[in-house]
Regions:
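Local beta-strand N-terminus motif with an aromatic residue
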Residues: 40-41, 67
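Class I SAM-dependent methyltransferase SAM/SAH-binding core
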Residues: 1-32
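Short alpha-helix
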Residues: 95-110, 114-116
Length: 184
């Protein structure tokens, strides 16, 4: 995974459940797939990592790296907070049907994949309004100075009852597509 935080969470969950046969690789799929340093594994997981670039080539490489199964996730519906921010800015937040294109591409490649929808509701914790703002700015398309002021004001109104420098918690909901297949 390109995200050190995601790897940290995976490792923590694996340790909690006594799972010791995971190899953690802190790189992008593009870096991983473009080198010969990764040998085939029983299972390959690609979560939110195939959003751009040559998808067919990346999927082919991932499929070659998997001996038994491949599991990939793609965001479908953004969180309610993201939708609120976009609505407040007067923008349209395009939901992401990329998984449909991936499914069709896999079929063209001769891979009979499965698709499961996963609704996720989790308690998110942020280190104050600045942390939430930084994550929104990272996910949003470019924000003008005016947009940044509007977003900060919105967040302060929404979470203002909490100390701006304290940990802010709220439920984040989203919908994901799990695209997976087993190898013959």
């Amino acid at each position: 995974d390109i995200s050190g935080e995601m790897l940290r969470l995976l490792k923590s969950n694996a340790e909690k459940h006594g799972i010791a046969n995971i190899r953690y690789i802190h790189r992008s799929w593009e870096e991983t797939c473009s080198t010969d340093t990764i040998e085939p594994h029983d299972v390959v997981v690609a979560s939110r990592s195939l959003m751009a670039g040559n998808l067919r080539e990346s999927i082919s490489r991932i499929d070659r790296l998997a001996r038994r199964a491949v599991y990939m996730t793609f965001p479908v519906v953004h969180s309610s907070l993201d939708r609120e921010v976009y609505r407040m800015l007067g923008r349209t937040l395009t939901e992401n049907p990329l998984y449909l294109s991936i499914y069709a591409m896999l079929f063209q490649m001769g891979i009979m994949a499965n698709v499961d929808m996963i609704r996720s509701v989790r308690t998110a914790q942020y280190n104050g309004i600045d942390d939430i703002f930084d994550r929104i700015r990272w996910r949003a398309d470019e924000l003008s100075d005016t947009d940044e002021i509007k977003v900060r004001k919105f967040l302060e109104e929404k979470f203002g009852e909490q100390n701006p420098s304290s940990v802010i918690t709220f439920n984040r909901d989203s919908l994901w597509a799990l695209v997976w297949w087993r190898k013959a």
